[in-house]
Amino acid sequence: MTEQNESAFNENEEVNEETSQTDSVENNDETTETSQDNLQEDDSQEIAEDVDPKDEEIQQLKKDVQENEEKYLRLYAEFENYKRRIQKENQTMKAYKAQDVLNDILPTIDNIERALQIDGEDEQFKSLKKGVEMVHESLLNALKNNGLEKIETEGQQFDPNVHQAVVQDDNPDFESGQITQELQSGYKLKERVLRPSMVKVNQ
């Protein structure tokens, strides 16, 4: 074998040796990666296996408790609203329980007021009228103590919420829209209008 051939042979052997080493390293790397993947899978399986069913049950119970607490709070709020509504309705009923009775009494008051508008010169008539005035005043005071209030009219500005205009007037002594005369008394029970006042309104 010539020196040139021997040199070429040696070079080929060195190249083959390096290639073998490279392949061996790559194979080792692949084996290492595969082993790591297998270890990770094993760890995941172990973690899954380590979860105690009791812990899962506890978590579920906590969740159920929280849901029940929320339901309870909602029901409690609804019940409190219901109680307040009932209390308000009871207070309203109590405040206006005399409404029907007062409505029945109003015509009697009207008759008394009409009688008081009659004038007479007779002493006996004057004495009788004075007695009726006292009864009228006493009756109104008693009704006032129970929440009845007479609606103000003459000289007031017309308010459709409490006044009923039945006649239009043309009086220079009053401003436009001002009440010049009350034709029938109106009454309120606390804030509720039992009957609007019938009035004459200046145009």
UniProtKB/Swiss-Prot annotation:
One GO cellular-component annotation of the UniProt record comes to:
cytoplasm
* Cross-referenced InterPro entries: GrpE, GrpE_coiled_coil, GrpE_head
Q: From the UniProt entry, list the residue stretches annotated as the region Disordered.
A: 1-67
Matching entries from SUPFAM superfamilies are given as: Coiled-coil domain of nucleotide exchange factor GrpE, Head domain of nucleotide exchange factor GrpE
What main location does UniProt list?
cytoplasm
SUBUNIT field: Homodimer.
Function text: Participates actively in the response to hyperosmotic and heat shock by preventing the aggregation of stress-denatured proteins, in association with DnaK and GrpE. It is the nucleotide exchange factor for DnaK and may function as a thermosensor. Unfolded proteins bind initially to DnaJ; upon interaction with the DnaJ-bound protein, DnaK hydrolyzes its bound ATP, resulting in the formation of a stable complex. GrpE releases ADP from DnaK; ATP binding to DnaK triggers the release of the substrate protein, thus completing the reaction cycle.
Protein name per Swiss-Prot or TrEMBL? Protein GrpE
